[in-house]
Design a protein with these regions (language model features):
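Short, well-structured alpha-helical segments in soluble
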Residues: 123-133, 242-254
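Hinge/beta->alpha junction and helix N-cap segments in small-molecule ligand-binding domains
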Residues: 84-88, 92-97, 121-125, 175-185, ...
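Amphipathic helical "hinge" segments at domain boundaries
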Residues: 46, 60-126
């Protein structure tokens, strides 16, 4: 066994010994210490005893929340909304979708005797601490091979995603809309109203929503013999990003018959660029948004949009996670039907 005395213990009056201190002294990972002290996982008896002895000699005491987990449940669900972290602010304009998910999830958690805690999307070393305190996690819009999903799976922590991780759709529990099918339905709506060349404005994040919708757009363009015209913009670019991208497109190429924008803010920006160019919606160009937002409803010409029903997504995610935490046998992959709000931007 490594001699714990080679590790410098905190002096009296300083911060207490942490699980990381134990891991360094025992020359194992933080997750190994957690499994050893909580009698979980598949560690050998020798490893468990070695870690326990190191912890005892250092005087390590588990954090109260970790002790709660050792005896059962903490009664807490963690919610990480990756898309908000990607914007760099939690007060982003157009964040209503995520606020609606979080609000509905909080109420649903309380109804199941759990508390909901919003956490920043962890990265780097902070991943090691994530799995120690919550009974389970909800991750909104994970990207392909998402490191947080990987970390929680490796730690055997229950998780549900809103939208699936594209690299392991069949291996995780999720609630989601069917981006591929609904994108095709919107494109057919536009085609039925006279649009042949449709420009698609998607996000840059490699999540299931963007990837499925883009795949559907390319397939639709191929099936109808039209050249795809795809613009990718970061969601954080908002209305200004949509306005700038469409203004540039109008200067450099033929005006398309319609725009299908993944986000409501991009759609609102596209509408402003069309207006600035002397074009009228819907007379000259049709617009649809793939996610309804206040900007769609208050645009000078209200914009047709898919309502992804974020409250329903939030409630379903909590219900599914609680079922998994409580070891109930339930369907672990659930599709939610969005609603299409027809507005003036597609009236012909």
């Amino acid at each position: 066994m490594p001699d714990p005395r080679t590790f410098r213990e905190p002096a009296p009056g300083t911060s207490r010994v942490t699980i990381r201190d134990v891991a360094r002294a025992a020359k194992v990972s933080v997750s190994t210490v957690s499994h050893a002290l909580n009698d979980t996982g598949t560690l050998s008896r020798d490893t468990r005893e070695r870690v326990a002895a190191t912890a005892a000699e250092l005087g390590y005491q588990a954090h109260p929340m970790a002790r709660g987990l050792r005896g059962g449940h903490s009664g807490v669900i963690g919610l990480s909304i990756r898309a908000l972290d990607d914007t760099g602010t939690y007060r982003a304009d157009g964040a209503h979708h995520f606020e609606r998910i979080a609000g509905a999830a909080a109420v649903a958690a309380l109804e199941s005797a759990f508390g909901l805690m919003l956490i920043p999307y962890p990265a780097g070393p902070s991943l090691e601490r994530v799995a120690l305190w919550a009974d389970g996690y909800i991750i909104e819009d994970p990207v392909s091979s998402d490191p947080l999903v990987t970390h929680l799976q490796n730690a055997n922590i229950p998780l549900v995603t809103v939208g699936w991780d594209p690299s392991r759709k069949s291996k995780t529990a999720w609630v989601s809309t069917d981006g591929r099918r609904h994108t095709t339905e919107v494109l057919e709506l536009l085609r039925g109203r006279g649009a042949r060349q449709v420009t698609f404005i998607s996000g840059t994040e490699r999540n299931s929503w963007n990837m499925q919708s883009e795949a559907a757009y390319r397939a639709w363009a191929r099936d109808h013999g039209v050249k795809p015209q795809l613009i990718r913009l970061p969601a954080a670019s908002g209305s200004a990003g949509g306005q700038s991208a469409v203004a540039t497109l109008l200067k450099n190429s033929r005006t398309p018959d319609a725009f299908y924008c993944q986000t409501g803010r991009h759609a609102a920006g596209a509408a402003r660029a069309l207006l600035d160019a002397g074009l009228e919606v819907p007379r000259d160009v049709l617009i649809v948004a793939g996610s309804d937002a206040e900007e769609c409803r208050t645009s000078p010409t209200p914009i047709t949009a898919l309502d992804l029903r974020p409250e329903h997504l939030g409630r379903e995610a909590v219900e599914l996670l609680v079922s998994i935490v409580e070891s109930r046998q339930v369907k672990r992959q659930r599709l939610i039907e969005p609603l299409l709000h027809l507005r003036a931007s597609t009236e012909r």
